[in-house]
Design a protein with these regions (language model features):
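Receiver (REC) domain active-site loop signature in two-component systems and cognate sites
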Residues: 57
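Conserved acidic segment of CheY-like receiver
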Residues: 2-15, 19-24, 51-52
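Short amphipathic alpha-helix used as the core "switch/output" element in two-component signaling
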Residues: 41, 63-75, 92-95
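As written
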Residues: 27, 62, 94-100
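Helix N-cap/capping motif at the beta->alpha junctions
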Residues: 32-41, 62
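C-terminal output helix
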Residues: 86-89, 98, 107-114
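Hydrophobic/aromatic residues positioned on beta-strands within the core alpha/beta folds
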Residues: 81-82
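Residues at the ends of beta-strands that form strand-to-helix hinge/output surfaces
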Residues: 103-104
Length: 114
């Protein structure tokens, strides 16, 4: 049985998913998803403690994804990782309680440690 804390990372860029998993797999149970839709399914079938999502994705933004899951998974910590300056949407999401924190890309492994 795996007792590691579970983290879901959602990003449409495959190389980001690979890098994230490689950086954190020793300490955490890392689940990755290339889409928000797949991320929702992973949330429904796994005990996830932290969601980290990219802000800019094709089907919906990271903020929109977190808005979709906040009511079904209210106790899961939600963070946005972005390389862009979508600060208005992200700050609004933080202020409304949908997002705990945002981190800019490229991410620092020490900054992301839970």
């Amino acid at each position: 049985m795996d007792d590691k804390f579970s983290v879901l990372y959602v990003d449409d860029e495959e190389h980001n998913l690979i890098s994230f998993k490689a950086a954190f797999r020793r300490d955490y149970n890392i689940l990755t998803s290339k889409s928000a839709k797949e991320g929702i399914e992973l949330l429904r079938h796994n005990n996830i403690g932290l969601i980290i999502t990219d802000q800019r994705m094709p089907e919906m933004t990271g903020v929109q994804f977190l808005e979709k899951v906040v009511h079904e998974f209210p106790n899961t910590v939600r963070m946005i990782l972005t390389g862009f300056s979508d600060l208005d949407a992200i700050i609004e999401a933080i202020n409304s309680g949908r997002v705990y924190r945002y981190i800019t890309k490229p991410w620092d492994q020490n900054e992301l440690k839970v």
